[in-house]
Design a protein with these regions (language model features):
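Bacterial N-terminal signal peptides
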Residues: 21-31
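Bacterial N-terminal signal peptides that target proteins for export
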Residues: 1, 8-22
């Protein structure tokens, strides 16, 4: 599991829209390391079922910002294994101009409890000339986060099983957690680490 971090000051200075963009293109990852205690929940104060948000995607290199595509995020109430849950779908599409350099068509699906605890994640990614499918199932037992993941690339599937004493998130559920935080008490230079 990779540990991703970003300075909270950057998240405060960048509007939520820009934070989302940076998270999606891998420029910024936020997080916190915490005890699982059989759950990794947060209070949802940032979104509700039926929400649909469009984002512009930008490439950032030093002082250069270039629009490279669009992203669409939808939020819906659902059930997962007969329990109430949220389903988040994110579709990222590069523009025709950027397709010349690097084609990007990503579809991400995340299912969480109503308290934003990750349950399932899938990413189908056409990036450049390759297509990958990543799937992750999360469960919680004996104070541990159990993560069963698999990646399919070029017809070959690799599977991995981890049991972690900390909360583990996927790239979409961590965004949802970050959107629910109140950064007003954070100080410059403070870092919050998340296991992903």
């Amino acid at each position: 599991m990779a540990i991703a971090a970003a300075t909270v000051v950057e998240a405060i200075a960048i509007r939520r829209k820009q934070l989302f963009i940076l998270l999606m293109v891998g420029a910024v990852c936020l997080g916190t390391s915490q005890s699982v205690q059989a759950q990794c929940t947060a209070k949802n104060e940032a979104f509700q079922s039926g929400e649909h948000v469009m984002y512009d995607l930008y490439f950032n290199w030093k002082f250069i910002w270039k629009k490279v595509g669009l992203a669409s995020l939808t939020t819906n109430a659902t059930t997962y294994h007969s329990e109430p849950a949220f389903r988040f779908n994110l579709l990222c599409v590069g523009s025709k101009k950027t397709d010349f350099f690097f084609k990007m068509r990503d579809t991400l699906t995340c299912i969480t409890t109503q308290q934003l605890e990750p349950l399932y994640f899938r990413k189908g990614a056409e990036e450049g000339k390759r297509y990958t499918v990543d799937e992750v199932n999360f469960s919680y037992r004996n104070g541990k986060c159990i993560v069963d993941q698999q990646r399919t690339l070029y017809g070959k599937t690799d599977k991995k099983h981890d049991e972690m004493p900390v909360c583990v998130y996927d790239m979409l559920s961590i965004l949802l957690q970050a959107r629910s935080y109140d950064p007003s008490d954070y100080k410059p230079g403070v870092k919050i680490l998340f296991s992903m």
